[in-house]
UniProtKB/Swiss-Prot annotation:
Stretches with biased composition (Basic and acidic residues): 47-63
Gene symbol of the encoding locus: sepF
Keywords assigned: Cell cycle, Cell division, Cytoplasm, Septation
Highest classification ranks of the organism: Bacteria, Bacillati, Bacillota, Bacilli, Lactobacillales
The protein, known as: Cell division protein SepF
Organism this protein belongs to: Streptococcus pyogenes serotype M2 (strain MGAS10270)
GO biological process: division septum assembly; FtsZ-dependent cytokinesis
Length: 218
């Protein structure tokens, strides 16, 4: 009996070892199963967070695009206000420019008219020679294309004839003309001036038939 009891104890001992090994195997398998489930849960939780991040990024991009569009293209109301504010300024500037152009054109026309009239005008100088040397001054006026009305009333007959001969010769050299217009007055004209004098009866004195001098004594 004692031997049998010892044999049964030995059998029961080995049976408990097998049970412990089985329990250890089951525990290890459960340990391996739990991390896998946790990994699957974690893996499933990450994809849920990624769409949220994508939505946030899309919102930021949309806002940034709207801001750039608003900066690039101003609102219609602001553009109309700017146009309305700039339009009166442009109108005033155009009016000022037109006024300046009109005044400048008028000034240019006046200058041109004055230049043309000055170039077309002919002056007539009235001279009262007192001596023979004054004849040279009269000829100088003829050289610059001026008409000279000569009155010999302050010269003696002999001096007047000498002065008249000198002026007549100079007028022929310069292609001018010398015409008698009064008893003691002669008109000396350049070549570009034509003189038309009507025939009139000039009273003659006993002094000379060709030269009717009515001279005064100095």
């Amino acid at each position: 009996m004692a031997f049998k009891d010892t044999f049964n104890k030995m059998i029961s001992y080995f049976d408990t070892d097998e049970v412990n090994e089985v329990e250890e195997d089951v525990a290890a398998s459960t340990d391996n199963v739990i991390p896998r489930s946790q990994q699957s849960v974690r893996a499933s939780s990450h994809p849920k967070q990624e769409p949220r991040n994508n939505h946030v990024q899309q919102d930021h991009q949309a806002r940034s695009q709207e801001q750039t569009r608003s900066q690039m293209h101003p609102k219609h109301g602001t553009s109309e206000r700017y146009y309305q504010q700039s339009q009166p300024k442009e109108g005033h500037e155009m009016v000022d420019r037109r006024k300046r152009m009109s005044t400048s054109s008028i000034a240019n026309r006046r200058e041109r008219y004055q230049q043309s009239t000055c170039s077309d005008q002919t002056t007539i100088a009235l001279k009262y020679p007192h001596k023979y040397e004054d004849a040279q001054e009269i000829v100088d006026l003829l050289i610059v294309n001026e008409c000279v009305l000569i009155d010999f009333q302050f010269m003696l007959d002999a001096q007047a004839r000498r002065c008249l001969d000198f002026i007549d010769g100079a007028s022929k050299v310069l292609y001018g003309s010398l015409q008698k217009v009064g008893s003691s007055m002669y008109l000396l004209a350049p070549s570009n001036v034509s003189v038309n004098i009507e025939e009139m009866t000039i009273p003659h004195t006993t002094q000379d038939i060709g030269f009717d001098f009515d001279m005064k004594r100095r």
